[in-house]
Curated annotation (Swiss-Prot):
Species of origin: Vibrio campbellii (strain ATCC BAA-1116)
Matches recorded under Gene3D superfamilies: Winged helix-like DNA-binding domain superfamily/Winged helix DNA-binding domain (1.10.10.10)
Superkingdom of the organism of origin: Bacteria
Cofactor binding note of this UniProt entry: Binds 1 [2Fe-2S] cluster per subunit.
Sorted UniProt keywords: 2Fe-2S, DNA-binding, Iron, Iron-sulfur, Metal-binding, Repressor, Transcription, Transcription regulation
Pfam families on file: Rrf2
Entries under PROSITE patterns matching the protein: HTH_RRF2_1 (PS01332), HTH_RRF2_2 (PS51197)
Protein name (database record): HTH-type transcriptional repressor NsrR
Keyword rRNA-binding: no
InterPro entries: TR_Rrf2-type_CS, Tscrpt_reg_Rrf2, Tscrpt_rep_HTH_NsrR, WH-like_DNA-bd_sf, WH_DNA-bd_sf
The HTH rrf2-type domain, residue ranges: 2-129
Molecular-function GO terms, alphabetical: 2 iron, 2 sulfur cluster binding; DNA-binding transcription factor activity; double-stranded DNA binding; iron ion binding
Length: 141
């Protein structure tokens, strides 16, 4: 299963925000520069993360973004569920005439559940914990 770039950038952003001191603000420019992502795309990612309650955005000259939830409360599986279309194949009868007898849909459903279960066991905090190399790469200049 391949995640969309939108979800990839969202996860990277959450990891970066979790690496900052608690309640410290950063801005979109800092995030886009760090990950080499277009500002336009990152604005959409941040807005969606805000709508979902993962980040808090503060408008104005001294504004920015920060985590709204504690890193230990954010599971990778939860983020993926919130952002990804998780239908692996289109098994509607209109689309595929073998759907009534096909066993592939059941296997794919089990694989998807196993994939998400693995991601549910991982929090944003765990991705940073005891990972000094990652913290160095995320450090502000």
């Amino acid at each position: 299963m391949q995640l969309t770039s939108f979800t990839d950038y969202a996860l990277r952003t959450l990891i970066y925000l979790a690496s900052l001191p608690k309640d410290e603000l950063t801005n979109i420019t800092e995030v886009t520069d760090l990950f080499g992502v277009s500002r336009n795309h990152m604005v959409k990612v941040i807005n969606r993360l805000g709508q979902l309650g993962y980040v808090h955005t503060v408008r104005g000259k001294n504004g920015g973004i920060r985590l709204m939830k504690a890193p230990q409360e954010i599971t990778v599986g939860g983020v993926v569920r919130d952002l990804e279309p998780l239908d692996l194949v289109n098994c509607s009868v209109e689309f595929c005439h073998i759907t009534p007898a096909c066993r592939l849909k059941e296997k794919l459903a089990k694989a998807k559940l196993a994939f998400l279960a693995e991601l549910d066991d991982c929090t944003i905090e765990e991705l940073l914990s005891d990972n000094s190399e990652l913290l160095i790469l995320l450090a502000r200049p």
